Amino acid sequence: MKILLVFVILFISVSAFPQNDSVKKASVVKGTVKNKTGKFVEGANVVIEGTIDGSTTDEKGYYEFETEKTGRRVIIFSAVDFGERKMNVDIEEGGTLVLDVTLSGTEFKTDEITVTASSFTSGENSRVTLTPLEITRIPGADADLYRAITTFSGSNQVDEGSRIAVRGGDPSEVLTFLDGASLYNPFLFGDNYNTSSYSTVNPWGMKGINFSSGGFSAKYGNVLSAVLDLQSYDMPQTKGMFAFIGLANAGLSGVYRNKDGKFGATFSAGQFFIKPFVEVNNDNTEFEPMPTASNLGGTLVFKTSNTGLLKLYLNYSYDNMGIKSESPTYNGFYSGRTKNIFTNLKYSFAPTDVSLLSTSVSFSSDNRTNKYGVLNTVSNSLYGKVRTDFATPVSENTDVSAGIEYEYNDFKENGRAPVYFYNLRENAPYYNLDFLRKTGRAGVYTELRYKFSDDFLLQGGVRSDYYTLTEKAVVDPRLSVVYRITRHSFVKAATGIYHQFPALIYFMRGNIPDLKPEQAVHYILGYEYNRENDFIFRLESYYKRYTNLVSNSYNYYNYTSDGKGYVTGVDAFLKIRLKPKFNGWLSYSYVDSKRTPYEGMNEVSADYDITHTLSLVSEYNISDYFTVGATYKISTGKPYTPVTGSIYDPSQNAYVPIYAELNSGRYPVYTRIDVNAQYIFALFGRFAVAFAALNNVLNTKNLYEYNYNFDYSQKWSVNSTNFRTI
């Protein structure tokens, strides 16, 4: 019987660049806020961007506050029924800055309706905006960006790790973009057996985290189902360091900005060491070697002009582990090792006062080693990408954007693989792997956003991509509309064609098959009600039709484009915020997903046809320093293919399993409860946060897979390694 497991994390924020012993003199910012007619605006918010320093205007429109922030800053003025205004200012230490501001009345522009607190953005259907603070506070998410996303409707965790499946699609149909670059392998332990994967993306390094589960715009290509669009911070606004210490990992990060504000840098380093965690939690899982991982990254930012910015993003990750796994013909350790390098150089500037031009150049390398019995492979994927985007308004009601990109990819695989899938012994027959494939993809898009009225917005675009390996091109038109019903509610609809070219792994064996680009057509209709971010309700229905999916031929390792399928479903989302104590949301998804994985067969349940998924997340502030939270998840079990019998193969001294209809079985219902608590305090005169989390409170034995004995006459459950942990 499992004993209660303990897991405690400590966050410590320390200044790497302390002030001098002399007290820094505070500066004063004051002034008045009026409307166009000269009347004072009461209750207007005045705040320094990126800080909590600010004030609110009184009945005479007057405001005044003190701040220790100095140098080049942006001050934001906003008020109900008025448009937001930003002012660039220079704040001198000990000085007084007087700012008298006039605010214009807001026009409630439909294309500018943005919900920022873990909700959705109109005009781009199914878009979820997350904040780093919310990500770190979600119980069970372990401060992981991708795990946090799975608490929203439309997405599911893959094997309780960080990889996600969206709206009945395959995880390979989800693509991450970082500052315009494609990020293909942002995970530690991504492909290991019964092991939770973790994201290499540091949410605190992101200024924009936007997740779209369908109906996304023409700027995104070569992806069928969903997009996670990340924007890293530009010039840091401060300097300091942040430390993290836990039972299983530790990390250190920091930011720096020079005095003139023209150079900045960030860094983050992390080390994953599971041995203390295993010993404290009395984990009986057998590891060889014990899981370890490292992650190192950062940015360098140069301000080249008033609007020009050059930013270099770097990230390196490494993981290594082995976990005990039993199969009918081999009982040993499944071992995997991964090395990943990602870098992106981006330059952006404003050619005019209202336009933006950006260009990025990125490179990534992903090296993987996998071994289990006779299987022993080493693969390496290289990606290079150049992309340019331009956006500008052409009139008061019309914005246009366009872009062009070229991406290079090569995939190499060496080693050996079993000839017979049912014989994995170390001395089993095998064939040698020694393959290399290269390809390129060129893409171009253009998009228009037109406001017919204050309540009606249309966004339409088209993109085209060309794949050099198969010499095939695609054209993808996309359209979305938003109509405001009332000040707080609107309806939205979207449709579009989406293509994704087959991965190079499908072209590795024998002659290059004539594979077509995979295609999905999205149809989305939704309703949303949002009252000042304190009450949000969203209901969205969708239908996706798949064609030209890569399918397996009954001839081993031959592939065709005969696959097809569909997904239909409904997503519901409800969020309630009761200031300042409570914040929580409920998400529900219904999915019906069918596909034809093999050539000529009927449609069956897809691998991620998870019919019902419900998540409930809550957070309660007991005081200004103490916060508790809880998450409850329940979902339909994943489909699987049962074994109904076996045939003995004397040449291999092994049994060949006889399978029932593909994905005709279901795992038991998945359920899990997670809780956490956070306490803010001072440690050695520095800001610190103590964080405790109890995952899988009821120690539910969620099924990972079934294993079978030598002749498949008996089976037993292999439960997930995500048992109860604190």
Segments from the language model and where they lie:
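Periplasmic N-terminal accessory/gating domains of Gram-negative outer-membrane beta-barrel systems
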Residues: 83, 93, 119-216, 227, ...
